[in-house]
């Protein structure tokens, strides 16, 4: 039979590690780039856009669709990096236990 006090200590330790991982993620920035760095987006660990940089060559009406696509690609690039880091941080906090598919840190 598992010692309940030991189980409780492990759960508290895991909870503390998860909180630390969430705080670290919230303070981390992720950069997504598209079009050979014509568009760059920086997001927070919470997935919020912090900065958008657009090369002046794209600021023409005839480049509108290209710019829209590049913004989408840059954001998705940054978000993917954030999601991967989030999964790695959470997995580390859980002492290497595997996570169910689609499970994410609750931000």
UniProtKB/Swiss-Prot annotation:
GO terms for cellular component: bacterial nucleoid; cytosol. The keyword rRNA-binding does not apply. Keywords: Cytoplasm, DNA-binding. NCBIfam families: DNA_YbaB_EbfC. Binds to DNA and alters its conformation. May be involved in regulation of gene expression, nucleoid organization and DNA protection. Its main location: cytoplasm. Gene3D superfamilies: Nucleoid-associated protein YbaB-like domain. It comes from Rickettsia typhi (strain ATCC VR-144 / Wilmington). PANTHER family: NUCLEOID-ASSOCIATED PROTEIN YBAB (PTHR33449:SF1). Homodimer. Belongs to the YbaB/EbfC family. It is found in: Cytoplasm, Nucleoid. The keyword Cytoplasm applies. One of its GO terms (molecular function) is DNA binding. This is Nucleoid-associated protein RT0857.
């Amino acid at each position: 039979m598992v010692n309940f006090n030991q189980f409780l200590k492990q759960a508290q330790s895991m909870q503390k590690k998860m909180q630390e991982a969430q705080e670290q993620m919230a303070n981390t920035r992720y950069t997504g780039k598209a079009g050979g760095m014509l568009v760059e987006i920086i997001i927070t660990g919470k997935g919020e856009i912090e900065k958008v940089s657009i090369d002046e060559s794209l600021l023409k009406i005839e480049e509108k669709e290209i710019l829209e696509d590049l913004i989408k690609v840059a954001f998705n690039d940054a978000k993917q990096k954030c999601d991967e880091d989030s999964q790695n941080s959470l997995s580390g906090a859980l002492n290497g236990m595997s996570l169910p598919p689609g499970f994410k840190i609750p931000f």
